[in-house]
Amino acid sequence: MEKPEFKVIIVGGSIAGLTLAHCLAQANIDHVVLEKRSAIAPQEGAFIGIWPNGARVFEQLGIFGDMEKQTVPFHRMHLRYPDGFSFSSSLPELVSERFGYPIITLDRQRVLEVLHERYPFKSNIIVNKKVVEIQTLDHGARVVTEDGAVYTGDLIVGADGVHSSIRSEMWRLADAISPGLITEHERKSLTVEYACVFGISSPIPGLESGELINSYSDGSCVITFHGEDGRVFWFMIEKLQRKYVYPDNPRFSVDDAAGFCARLSSVPIWRDICVAHLWRNRISVSMTALEEGLFQTWHFGRVVLLGDSVHKMTPNIGQGANTAVEDAATLASLINGLLKSGSASHTSDSDINNLLRVFQSLRYDRVKRTYQQSCSGARLQTRDDFLKILVGRYVFPYVGDYISHSMCKDISGGHVIDFLPLPKRSKAGWAKYSRSNRSRATQLQWGSIWLSPVILCLFCMLFLWPWSSSLPISS
């Protein structure tokens, strides 16, 4: 009897899950998407930034144009500090010129709608299917949903977000088969130190389309993105009084968001605009705890995790969704490679394990670097300690070339779908910044060497100079 086709079960109609579905459809690989909610694209008041590394994958899939035409590209950013100092930068425009893709922001709902609308096999996406159990088989695996339905396949992909049931099931299987693989440290590695209010507001005079603003304060920050027709996407984060370990997270309501914004209502954003203006013009708003964590175990058996289910970061550098898109592109490329190699007729547990080990090895270091940048970004923008206040205020505004070069190198390393052609609109920045005579370690080493004397000089200026100026000068 002919062996059934290789099948992927994607749990979660998230950006990661739907992107993977698009990739697999392009490769004619059988799959199904199971979403626990009743709708693929609910309005939750959240939004996402799409950077060139995510845009390039969407362009390979032929869907980036649908997203791009619904907003305006960013060309300028402004940064404001609590002492009133501010500066502006054309970094967003520079990134677009170098890579051929702009930085844009869209409602998360609209991104999901585009992914769903442009997906060619709607019957493969099934809503109201909450997965409650994973069962292992001799030559595959299956999931059982809350309503008793069973879906069998060769690979189960957890794209179900930070509260992933697939991660929990993967851990349960690992505990039964390989006790000790999932350590207590890993189970507690997802933590919460910040709360965040996401919002979308109607146009506010003085906030120009195509611009974004970072307003830093002690313990909090406000970041606004001004889209098409002046629509304002924004988020505010604030350091909590203590650190929480998942799943013992604080929970927040709309009333909490109202209280949060009322308490920060007078915090300035730009010129005479303050938080109160964002709240007054709000269209939608939500408040959530910001989990942070990078798990060490991305796969076990025939189960693998993507996106927020395995690496969760704050929104400060805007790479969460883009990182998930890269995950999907990489995994689809590896699956396609396995099937094209002729191994499709006998995808043993060993075949799948080898594929997933390669997947994690390809993605882990890049994701770790992005995660660390996200952690640092949140703490720099909220002026978390004296050193970050010092660097953020007196170093950051004056090292634009260093920052833009480092950012472009990070973007250029983005993973793509290797069985689809690269888009023609891609510009020279991809090749230019991916080539380097220095390794990452060397780059970071020189960055540290460069920054150390700057910080040392600032220390001397701030602390030693006042004392030395009061000392008698010897003849």
UniProtKB/Swiss-Prot annotation:
Molecular function GO terms recorded: FAD binding; monooxygenase activity
Alphabetized Gene3D superfamilies for the sequence: FAD/NAD(P)-binding domain (3.50.50.60)
Needed co-factor(s): FAD
Active site residues according to the UniProt entry: Y216
Ribosomal protein as UniProt keyword: no
Reactions accelerated catalytically: [(1'E)-3'-hydroxy-3',7'-dimethylocta-1',6'-dien-1'-yl]-quinolinone B + NADPH + O2 + H(+) = [(1'E)-5'-(3',3'-dimethyloxiran-2'-yl)-3'-hydroxy-3'-methylpent-1'-en-1'-yl]-quinolinone B + NADP(+) + H2O
Source organism superkingdom: Eukaryota
Disruption phenotype: Leads to the disappearance of penigequinolone, and the accumulation of the styrenyl quinolone precusor as well as the minor metabolites yaequinolone J1 and J2.
Enzyme Commission designation: 1.-.-.-
Pfam assignment, any one: FAD_binding_3
Annotated FAD binding sites: E35, G49, R108, D308, A321
Glycosites: N437
Entry keywords, A to Z: FAD, Flavoprotein, Glycoprotein, Membrane, Monooxygenase, Oxidoreductase, Transmembrane, Transmembrane helix
Transmembrane segments: 446-466
Membrane topology reported for the UniProt record: Single-pass membrane protein
Primary residence: membrane
Biological pathway: Secondary metabolite biosynthesis; Alkaloid biosynthesis; Mycotoxin biosynthesis
A single cellular component GO annotation: membrane
Subcellular compartments: Membrane
Keyword Glycoprotein: yes
Role according to the record: FAD-dependent monooxygenase; part of the gene cluster that mediates the biosynthesis of penigequinolones, potent insecticidal alkaloids that contain a highly modified 10-carbon prenyl group. The first stage is catalyzed by the nonribosomal peptide synthetase penN that condenses anthranilic acid and O-methyl-L-tyrosine to produce 4'-methoxycyclopeptin. 4'-methoxycyclopeptin is then converted to 4'-methoxydehydrocyclopeptin by the ketoglutarate-dependent dioxygenase penM through dehydrogenation to form a double bond between C-alpha and C-beta of the O-methyltyrosine side chain.
Family: Belongs to the paxM FAD-dependent monooxygenase family.
Protein name (Swiss-Prot/TrEMBL): FAD-dependent monooxygenase penE
Organism: Penicillium thymicola
Name of the coding gene: penE
